[in-house]
Amino acid sequence: MEINNGAQPENAAVSIPSRSPSGKSEKRKSPSIVSGCRTVMNERSFTNYWSVERFTVQLELHNPAEFMLAPKFGDGDYEFVMKLFPNGKDEETAGYLSLFLLINKCPNPRLRFRVSFTVETADGPRSCHLNKNLVTINRSGIVTASKFFSLDILRSAMNVYIPNDILTIGCELTIFGECTTQISSLFKPYQRTHSASSTSRSLSSPNTKCLKIDESSAHDAFTEFLSTGEFSDFIIVASCGREFPTHMCILAARSEYFKVLLRNHSTKEFMSKRLQFDDISARTLDVLLRHMYASAAGRVVKLEEDQLTEDLISAMDRLMINSLRDEVARLIGSKVTVDNVLTRISMAAELRLDDTYDVLLDFFSNHKHECMKLTAWDELESAKPPLAIKILRDAFSNTDSPSTTSMDSRIIDRITLT
């Protein structure tokens, strides 16, 4: 009797399902569809230089609000004109050069651009730029630099800023046009090659010795030098007669005013190593100097509410301590009330803090009837009539049409010295 136990012959073919290494049956992937496109922006750039000879004579011949016009520049689609006020555009800016850029011709209703004004000096170009990286204004609009350059600084270093009695101003414009999107070839990701990675790693090999600097100790040392006067080489005197022993390297590094003043070794201040301010208080100088020394060590000393005074704002603008601008903008834009908005909006206007000015203007627009009943409004009208008119005009324009009218009716004043 034969018993069949189901065993297969040795040479019999056995069918085994195909499986992936993970034990699952493989599934064929459907092909992916890849496409690409690129968006490009049309740009145009213009550069124009204007040299004014016998500039010291021009200063004598022109009163505030009197101006000079440069020839037009541009191309067939765009046309611009520079307008210079040697002694300021009005009495309020009489201590500064004022520079306007007029847009005479533009193919589009609105113009988007980035602008840079420069003064060509014996030490190279000094540039001024807009606080906002990108500016949009209407066709036939005006860009103004009301306080383009201090005449006091110019006169203190005439051989630097007007060599051979020639003032040369440069204007660089980059205009951003419409964007176009086109279908392009397949996108190829950027490859980070092994060689680039190994080069990067080699710069920080274990055998490399690094010098680590304790920032807190540097800050403490700088503050101590200011407090003790150790190693000081320059004396600043406040209006009350209090003396501050300081260090020229810190002053020049943190203030454009002192950089220009101390660069000219023939000035009385440099030779005597002493500078007296008849209109800046000791309290204000103490706040400014502490900030300058802290920022030189990479620290920021926050301003207190009681330190925010008009004396501080004027001194900061005069000494061109640009590193303090963000802290001032933060402080004057917070805890705004009907009682303090007028003082703060005046500060924002003086420092040309345009974003902060717009925020404060919105608050004033919503409470203008209350604000205009305050004594502070009467004082502003009496002390700074042009500013009071500007604030009022901007407020009503802002109320009428927040999206466009305020932008259209205001002259943009956004240039600061760098």
UniProtKB/Swiss-Prot annotation:
Domain of life the protein comes from: Eukaryota
Segments forming domain BTB: 232-293
GO MF term (any one): ubiquitin protein ligase binding
SUPFAM superfamilies: POZ domain, TRAF domain-like
Record keywords, A-Z: Ubl conjugation pathway
Biological-process GO terms, alphabetical: proteasome-mediated ubiquitin-dependent protein catabolic process; protein ubiquitination; regulation of proteolysis
Purpose of the protein: Probable substrate-specific adapter of an E3 ubiquitin-protein ligase complex which mediates the ubiquitination and subsequent proteasomal degradation of target proteins.
UniProt protein name: BTB and MATH domain-containing protein 41
Organism: Caenorhabditis elegans
GN (gene name): bath-41
